[in-house]
A protein has these predicted regions:
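Single-stranded RNA-binding regions, centering on S1/OB-family and related RNA-binding modules
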Residues: 1-237
Length: 237
C-alpha cells in the first residue's frame, strides 16, 4: 500500500486552488498511470494483515541522488545530450508523460516524432520503456530537479529521404493528423508530412480520416508536401 502523499505527484497550486481540487487532480493522474511500472521503498510490514506500506517518493528521491547529483569526480550520470531509458507513465492524444530516473516530464507530440502524429496513444502505451535524449537539466536540490527530453532526435528523421518519393501531381493516400484554422495536416502512407489548404470533397475532413491527397508543390526546406484533398476515402466515425 502506497499512500497518495507518498506517490510524489506534485501539482502547482495557485490562489484559486483548494484541497478538493488538488486531490481530484491527483486521483485523475493516478488513474492515468494504471499499468505503469514504478519504484518504491518498503517502509513497514504488518504481519497480521500481511500488508506492506511503501513510498514511491523515497524511491524517486534516492534515484535522483544517484543519477542527477554529481559524484566524487563532479560528474552526473544524467546530463544534457545523453540518451537514457525512460518509463511511460501516461499517454494522452498530444503528450506522453515519462519518468526519467526519479523525475517526471511530459513530452509533447512534436518532440515524440518528426512525423506528424495525430494521436500519441497509437504509438505509445503505459508501461513502455523508451529511449529519450536529455535536452535540459536543472538541479537546485534533490527535491527540486527539472528535466527536458525528446524522442525524435533518438529515432531520427527520414522525412527528407521519403520526400523524394513525392512527385508533383502525384496522388497519395494519407491520414489527417490535425486541422488548424482551415489548414489540414496529413501523414501520407509513404512516410511524408503533407499540408492541404483545400478539399474538393463535399464533406469536411476530420481528424483520423483517410484521404486522397494530390501534391501541387514540394517544400524542401520544411520537408513537407503541399497540395489538396481530392476526396475523403474513409471517415473516422
Amino acid at each position: 500500500m502506497i499512500p497518495l502523499s507518498e506517490m510524489m505527484i506534485n501539482l502547482k497550486e495557485d490562489a484559486s486552488s483548494n484541497y478538493g481540487d488538488i486531490i481530484n487532480r491527483q486521483n485523475k493522474i493516478l488513474g492515468n498511470m494504471l499499468g505503469s511500472e514504478i519504484d518504491f521503498l518498503i517502509k513497514g510490514i504488518d504481519n497480521k494483515t500481511r500488508a506492506v506500506a511503501a513510498s514511491r517518493k523515497d524511491a524517486m528521491l534516492k534515484k535522483r541522488q544517484i543519477f542527477y547529483l554529481p559524484d566524487a569526480n563532479g560528474v552526473s550520470r544524467v546530463c544534457e545530450g545523453r540518451i537514457v531509458q525512460a518509463r511511460v507513465l501516461a499517454v494522452a492524444e498530444k503528450t506522453a508523460r515519462v519518468e526519467i530516473f526519479g523525475v517526471e516530464y511530459s513530452i509533447s507530440a512534436r518532440d515524440l516524432s518528426y512525423d506528424w502524429m495525430g494521436d500519441a496513444t497509437d504509438s505509445y502505451h503505459v508501461g513502455d520503456q523508451i529511449l529519450v535524449r536529455i535536452t535540459h537539466v536543472s538541479v537546485t536540490s534533490v527535491s527540486d530537479i527539472t528535466v527536458k527530453a525528446d524522442v525524435k532526435s533518438v529515432i531520427g528523421n527520414a522525412s527528407a529521404e521519403n520526400l523524394k518519393k513525392c512527385k508533383v501531381q502525384g496522388k497519395y493516400i494519407g491520414t489527417v493528423t490535425d486541422i488548424h484554422k482551415g489548414t489540414v495536416f496529413i501523414r501520407l502512407s509513404i512516410g511524408v508530412n503533407a499540408v492541404a489548404h483545400s478539399c474538393y470533397d463535399s464533406r469536411l475532413p476530420g481528424k483520423k480520416d483517410e484521404v486522397s491527397f494530390v501534391v501541387t508543390r514540394i517544400d524542401s526546406e520544411r520537408n513537407v508536401a503541399v497540395g489538396l484533398i481530392s476526396r475523403i476515402v474513409k471517415q473516422n466515425i
